[in-house]
Amino acid sequence: MTTKYIFVTGGVVSSLGKGIAAASLAAILEARGLDVTIMKLDPYINVDPGTMSPTQHGEVFVTEDGAETDLDLGHYERFIRTKMTRRNNFTTGRIYADVLRKERRGDYLGATIQVIPHITNAIKERVIAGAEGHQVAIVEVGGTVGDIESLPFLEAIRQLAAEVGRNNAMFMHLTLVPYLAAAGEVKTKPTQHSVKELLSIGIQPDVLICRSDRAIPAVERAKIALFCNVPERAVISMKDVDSIYKIPALLKSQNLDSYFTERFGLECKEADLAEWEQVIYEEANPTAEVTIGMVGKYVSLPDAYKSVNEALKHGGLKTRLSVNIKYIDSQDIETRGAELLEGLDAILVPGGFGERGVEGKIQAAQYARENKIPYLGICLGMQVAMIEFARNVAGMEGAHSSEFKKDCAYPVVGLITEWVDDEGNIETRTEKSDLGGTMRLGSQLCHLVEGSKVRQMYGSPTIYERHRHRYEVNNKLLPQIEAAGLKVTGLSADKKLVEIIEIPDHPWFVAAQFHPEFTSTPRDGHALFAGFVKAAGEYQKRNLK
C-alpha cells in the first residue's frame, strides 16, 4: 500500500486554523472509508511542549502512549477515530537532539552535519514512520511560511513530495483573505504574496484554503486561481462559523474531498457525515443552559484548558444542555473570597502545577462541598479536594501537598516514587529527576469500585484513562480521611494508587487523578463529563424550584 501525503501549510498570519482544517479534511476522508492519520511538525526548539508555559503555548495534549504533544493533536482525535501517538508530533528540538545524539555516537562517520541533508533527512524519516500503515497521512507544518524556523520542515516536505511522486503527494495552503470595509471587498493580494513566498521555497500549492469572515465571491476565487496557478475548484472558501464541527460539511460542500481522491486515484464511497450532522443538531438545539465555573490559574488563555472546554461542550451535547463556561482565576478567590463562585450550577477545578493559586482552588472545593454544588476535580483538582476534606472534615489541620509544603503536618499528597505502568514495568522517580518527560504519563488501567457513581456512569468495572502527574494521594493517611466520609472509588492497575474519589453524601462530588478530557469526543462524549453536566442541570432545576 502506497501512502498518500497531504502537506498543510499556512501563510499571511498565524492562528488561521490549520489544525482544524487538517482535522476536518481528515474527518471527511475517514467518512469515505479511508484510513487517515494526521501529524503536526512544530518548528520550536523545545524538545516537546511538556515544560512550556500553558499561558504561552496552550494545553499539553497527552496521547495514549504517554507523549506530551501540541494541542492540535487533541483536535485530530476529536475529529477522527485514529488515536494519536508520539509519532504524530515532533519538534525542531526533537530532530536536532536526535541528530546530535547520532553525531556524538559517530553514526555519521565524521561527516559535516548540515541542515541539508541531515536535518531534512531526519524529518522525512519521522514523517514516513508516522504515516506507515495508513492510506492517507495529513502533515501539518506549524508556523507561517516566511518564518525562518519552519524552513527545514518546508524543505523536507518539498523533498519528500518529489521522492514519493506527485501522484502520491499534494500541498494544501491556508491563507487569509481579509475584508476591507472601506473598500467593501475582500483583498486577494496577501494570498498572492504568500503563494509567491511558498513558490520561492520550491512548493507549488495544489489547494488553497482561503480564510475569511465571509464567503469569498466566485470572481475573487477565480482571480486567486489565476494568479496562484491552481484550478478554480481547488480554491476553497473557509468562512468563520460559530462551531468548528461545521467545518467538515463546509469543506465537503465545495467538494474538497473529491478533489483529493480524484488526484490520488483513490476509489472510495461517498462521505457520510450523518454523525457530524447529529453533533451540529445537538449543539444548535439545547433544552437549557448551565453555567459551570472553571477555577484555574491559566484562565488568561482559555486554550490552556482546550480539551476541558471541548469536553464540557461534549457533555452538553449528550445531555442537550448548552454549557456556559465562566473562567475564574483561583488567585482572585484568595483575595476576593468565595462569593465569586455564587450563581454557578457546577464547579470544575482542572489540572495545574506550582503553588500559585492553590489556596483559591482549595476554597473552591470547600464551597462546592459545603453548598452541595456539583464538583469535578481533574488531576490537581482531585488533590485540592483531598486536602480540603482532610483539613476541614477529617480534622487534619495543616494538611497539604508536599509539592507545595514539604514539612506540612499531614502530607496527604506526595511525590510518586514508584509505580507500575500498563505493561507491568516498574517506573521510579526522585525529586532530582528532570521535569521533562518524567511524569506518570499516558493511558493507565483503573479499577472502579462497585456501587460507586463512576462505576454507574462508565458502566464497566475497569477503564483506561490518560495521566500526566508526578504527585499522588498519600495512602498512609487514607484511613483517617475515609473514616470521615470520603471514599476512594477508583484504583490503579496494581491497586496502590488512588485514581478517583467521591463524597457519597454529596449529590455529585467526583474527582479524578487522570485527565478524562483527553478522551472526550463530540460524537461519543465522555461518561464523566456527561454525568457532570447532567448534575449541573439537576442542581439548576432544584434551585429554580
Swiss-Prot record:
Its EC number is 6.3.4.2. CTP binds at residues 14, 147-149, 187-192, 223. The active site is at residues 379, 515, 517. InterPro entries: Class_I_gatase-like, CTP_synthase, CTP_synthase_N, GATASE, GATase1_CTP_Synthase, P-loop_NTPase. Pathway: Pyrimidine metabolism; CTP biosynthesis via de novo pathway; CTP from UDP: step 2/2. Residues 291-542 form the Glutamine amidotransferase type-1 domain. Residues 1-266 are annotated as: Amidoligase domain. It is an enzyme of class 6 (ligase). ATP binds at residues 15-20, 72, 239-241. GO terms for cellular component: cytosol. One of its GO terms (biological process) is 'de novo' CTP biosynthetic process. Mg(2+) binds at residues 72, 140. Allosterically activated by GTP, when glutamine is the substrate; GTP has no effect on the reaction when ammonia is the substrate. The allosteric effector GTP functions by stabilizing the protein conformation that binds the tetrahedral intermediate(s) formed during glutamine hydrolysis. Inhibited by the product CTP, via allosteric rather than competitive inhibition. It catalyses: UTP + L-glutamine + ATP + H2O = CTP + L-glutamate + ADP + phosphate + 2 H(+); L-glutamine + H2O = L-glutamate + NH4(+); UTP + NH4(+) + ATP = CTP + ADP + phosphate + 2 H(+). L-glutamine binds at residues 352, 380-383, 403, 470. Keywords: ATP-binding, Glutamine amidotransferase, Ligase, Magnesium, Metal-binding, Nucleotide-binding, Pyrimidine biosynthesis. UTP binds at residues 14, 187-192, 223. The keyword ATP-binding applies. Catalyzes the ATP-dependent amination of UTP to CTP with either L-glutamine or ammonia as the source of nitrogen. Regulates intracellular CTP levels through interactions with the four ribonucleotide triphosphates. NCBIfam families: PRK05380.1, PyrG. CTPSs have evolved a hybrid strategy for distinguishing between UTP and CTP. The overlapping regions of the product feedback inhibitory and substrate sites recognize a common feature in both compounds, the triphosphate moiety. To differentiate isosteric substrate and product pyrimidine rings, an additional pocket far from the expected kinase/ligase catalytic site, specifically recognizes the cytosine and ribose portions of the product inhibitor. This is CTP synthase. It comes from Aeromonas hydrophila subsp. hydrophila (strain ATCC 7966 / DSM 30187 / BCRC 13018 / CCUG 14551 / JCM 1027 / KCTC 2358 / NCIMB 9240 / NCTC 8049).
